[in-house]
Amino acid sequence: MEPNNHHDGLNGQKADNPLEVAIVGGGLTGLALALGLLRRNVNFTIYERAASFGELGVGIHFTPNAERAMKALDPRILQSYVDVATHAEGGFLSFVDGLHDDDLLFQLRMGEGYKAARRCDIVSQLVKHIPQERVQLLKWLQSVEEDAEGRAVLTFRDGSTAKADVVVGCDGIRSQVRSAMFGSGPSAPRAQYAHQLAFRGLVPMAKVAATLGPEKTSRAIGYLGPGGFVLSVPLAGINMMHLEVFVMDPLPWSDDTTGSKPDKDKDEDDVKRYVLPSTRAEAEKAFTEFNPTVRSLISLLPEELGKWAIFDMLDSPAPSYALGRMCLAGDAAHASTPNQGGGAGAGMEDSLVLAEILAALADRAKSGARVGSWEISEGLKIYSDARYERAQWLVQSSRRVAQLFTRKKGAGQGGEEEEPISREILERSHQLWDYDVDAAVEEALGKLRAKVLEKH
């Protein structure tokens, strides 16, 4: 869908209207929302706590629904991804028997084909399109309060403050905006350990070809088996294979910072909480019963590597994605496991719905009509209502997909089990991919018009 006649914001100059949006967090969701607002001529400032833009993690891929949302937000977002992505041979993500003989179980073909890229490469492309004056780095949010006029006042750890009409938390699984909305106590919504961990690394294509043959370097493959699975995705642009080794873990996540330091100190090294030092031997230990292909792939990982805890918000979800002048998008709203490949794409859908609602409110403000606390609050509630059911479904579904990938019976041990597993995964995949985000936007805008824009 095309944005609603807001193409005059592409030059990056501040729009001549009173609505100001604070985007807290400059990851993929925050940058995509920023470009969507820029295209729709809505004022915004990104407040990023780091000294530069970056993304945790290595590889990423976007499903067809996400690509449609990216194009509708701003075609440059989708193009930024396409420009740095590698297309898998045949356009398929193939799933094979990782326990026995590499037999093909099923394939998923997504839209124009499966492709993947490095997160940092996409971020680097997106940042090129955002004017520097719209960005504030080293801004670590401390609190959000209201001033006497009802506007939001953001206070940062360096003592500086900023005012905004809308605050959007795109600040990830440990969202400070979410804490400002719902608190940070034991009963507050938060990301929790999903009892899944991952070992991740990049392996030179030449090593993969020498060990397993050149045919393994051009295909995206998932090796499935009891208790774990391995994904190998080619990144041809850098001649590397991205390996992700996932292990289901019934134990609590033990990290060396939780409960041992004040919150401020814990926050200042998030990576220590979610990524612990580990070894290739630990990863190999979890896959001793898998076939030689899987064991050989894992043997190509570096001797020392990180062990990533996978967190999601299934067990402690946010009751809403909006409260007053604040709202959440992406992982801050609905962090999910990576098993269905839909988490980042859900952030793109969030950004599109939110950008269209904020553009409609900004147009109202430019016309001289009132856009105060009530109008903004109602608009953000409509955004939350538009996104909540689908995003929470994804969190649950992604957990379920991991259960299917790591079924206790090995693949090839009975056709009765294999068919429903592949069928359910395909059904869940199409529920993710076939979503009509344009219709969701139109429905949300219709509610906004009926409740806010045409009432006053």
Swiss-Prot record:
It comes from the Eukaryota. It holds the Pfam family FAD_binding_3. It is found in: Membrane. Its cofactor is FAD. The active site is at residue 200. The keyword Acyltransferase does not apply. Keywords: FAD, Flavoprotein, Glycoprotein, Membrane, Monooxygenase, Oxidoreductase, Transmembrane, Transmembrane helix. InterPro entries: FAD-bd, FAD/NAD-bd_sf, FAD_monoxygenase. Disruption phenotype: Leads to the production of only traces of sorbicillinol, probably resulting of chemical conversions and not of enzymatic activity. Abolishes production of trichodimerol and dihydrotrichotetronin in darkness. Also impacts production of paracelsin in a light dependent manner, with decreased paracelsin levels in light, but likely in an indirect way. Its EC number is 1.-.-.-. GO terms for biological process: secondary metabolite biosynthetic process. Gene3D superfamilies: FAD/NAD(P)-binding domain (3.50.50.60). GO terms for cellular component: membrane. The keyword Oxidoreductase applies. Glycans are attached at residue 43. Its main location: membrane. Pathway: Secondary metabolite biosynthesis. FAD binds at residues 48, 119, 331, 344. The chain crosses the membrane at residues 18-38. It is an enzyme of class 1 (oxidoreductase). Induction: The promoter contains putative CRE1 binding motifs 5'-SYGGRG-3' and expression is differentially regulated in light and darkness by CRE1. Photoreceptors BLR1 and BLR2 negatively regulate the expression, while ENV1 exerts positive regulation. Moreover the SOR biosynthetic genes show a mechanism of positive feedback on each other in darkness. GO terms for molecular function: FAD binding; monooxygenase activity. Belongs to the paxM FAD-dependent monooxygenase family. FAD-dependent monooxygenase; part of the SOR gene cluster that mediates the biosynthesis of sorbicillinoids, a diverse group of yellow secondary metabolites that restrict growth of competing pathogenic fungi but not of bacteria. Sorbicillinoids biosynthesis requires the action of two PKSs. The SOR cluster is required for the production of trichodimerol and dihydrotrichotetronin, with sor2 being sufficient for production of trichodimerol, but not dihydrotrichotetronin in the light. This is FAD-dependent monooxygenase sor5.
